[in-house]
């Protein structure tokens, strides 16, 4: 929802959800920040996104920004180890997000469904959905 023109399917899906059912991981917040850091330093889009990440996203999610706890870190450790043993290493951020969703019994909403395949976490992509 940080795009100037969000995907209409995503916007419609978000609108249908009760706010209290939507959560975000601190890992996702870090990924958003990293993405902004990669933009040209003086660009107006970077300044706009920085403002949204620091002000609007915390407001939207308020007390629903989930930390990485010891239990989540331990879940990630198992997920990551299993994937490495299977010869399918995963991105650390994706693993932490999956572990957070598993710990809280949540569904990961992402465009990158394949990144979460085989992790035992429920995944949904509203991109292209109606």
Task: Annotate each language-model stretch with its function.
Residues 5, 60, 111:
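Residue-level signal for short amphipathic helical patches enriched in basic/charged
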Residues 98-130:
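Acidic, PIN/NYN-like endoribonuclease modules and their adjacent C-terminal/linker elements
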Residues 21, 34-40, 59-107:
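Active-site neighborhoods of divalent-metal-dependent phosphate/nucleic-acid chemistry enzymes
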Residues 25, 90-91, 112, 130:
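Histidine- and aromatic-rich ligand-binding microenvironments
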Residues 1-28, 37-55, 71, 118, ...:
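Short, well-structured N-terminal submotif of metal-dependent ribonuclease cores
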Residues 5-9, 92, 108:
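Short, conserved clusters of charged catalytic residues that mark active-site
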């Amino acid at each position: 929802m940080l795009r100037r023109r969000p995907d209409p399917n995503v916007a419609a899906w978000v609108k249908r959800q009760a706010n209290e059912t939507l959560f975000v991981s601190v890992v996702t917040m870090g990924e958003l920040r990293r993405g902004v850091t990669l933009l040209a330093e003086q660009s107006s889009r970077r300044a706009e996104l920085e403002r949204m990440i620091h002000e609007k996203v915390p407001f939207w999610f308020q007390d629903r920004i989930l930390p990485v706890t010891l239990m989540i870190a331990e879940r990630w450790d198992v997920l990551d180890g299993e994937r490495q043993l299977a010869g399918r290493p995963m991105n650390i951020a994706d693993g932490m997000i999956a572990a957070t969703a598993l710990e809280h019994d949540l569904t990961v909403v992402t465009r990158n469904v394949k990144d979460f395949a085989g992790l035992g976490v429920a995944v949904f992509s509203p991109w292209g959905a109606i």
